[in-house]
Design a protein with these regions (language model features):
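A structural signal for multi-pass alpha-helical bundles of membrane permease subunits
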Residues: 1-187
Length: 187
């Protein structure tokens, strides 16, 4: 990510970011069949690993877009000072860039988690066993059309499902705001 912001020319960087954002405009429903067939071929259908890989692939352009703003505004002087002190690129990244980018990483991770937590269609299509169902599919499957659902249990489960991202957002609110704003200002 840092290499995209630092070493790629402005025109190429804009083209790459536009291509990433364009992939986010493709409806997920239109690519579910190829994802399904790919996971079936890899024998990852109906597994949590398959869901994690799918959500990771679907949310990666969004996360890259969020982090690019931070890395674009990252001061090159810090990297140059580390190079003068004898740090390799890897050590510069692990000792300087990564610790300073934790807020942005938390912000991107929080957005990705909430997007995958609240998604329904991917979990419904790619899983059939109850063990691999995400919470949104569990709640939907509990609405049995044959018998009267237990509304108290369903409401309690819905509240718990809504509390997880709410508590996470509350706990990480300052970190997420710092991460969102860290790449927002120029200069």
């Amino acid at each position: 990510m840092g290499s995209l912001s630092r070493f790629v020319g402005r025109r190429a960087r804009r083209t790459l970011l536009l291509a990433l954002l364009t992939t986010r405009m493709i409806p997920v429903v239109s690519i579910l069949i190829p994802i399904y067939l790919g996971l079936q071929r890899l024998q990852l259908l109906n597994t949590r690993t398959g869901l994690i890989l799918t959500y990771g692939g679907l949310l990666l352009p969004f996360v890259i877009w969020i982090l690019e703003g931070f890395y674009r505004g990252f001061p090159a002087e810090l990297e140059e000072a580390a190079a003068i002190d004898g740090c390799s690129r890897l050590r510069t990244f692990t000792r300087i860039v990564l610790p300073l980018s934790t807020n942005s990483l938390f912000a991107a991770g929080a957005f990705a988690f909430i997007a995958s937590w609240s998604d329904f269609i991917v979990g419904l299509v790619l899983t059939t066993s109850e063990a691999a169902w995400p919470i949104s599919v569990v709640l939907a499957q509990s609405l049995n059309p044959i018998s009267e659902p237990s509304w108290g249990l369903l409401n309690s489960a819905g509240l718990i499902a809504a509390l997880v991202p709410a508590v996470m957002a509350f706990v990480l609110r300052r970190t997420v705001m710092r991460g969102m704003l860290s790449g927002a200002l120029k200069g």
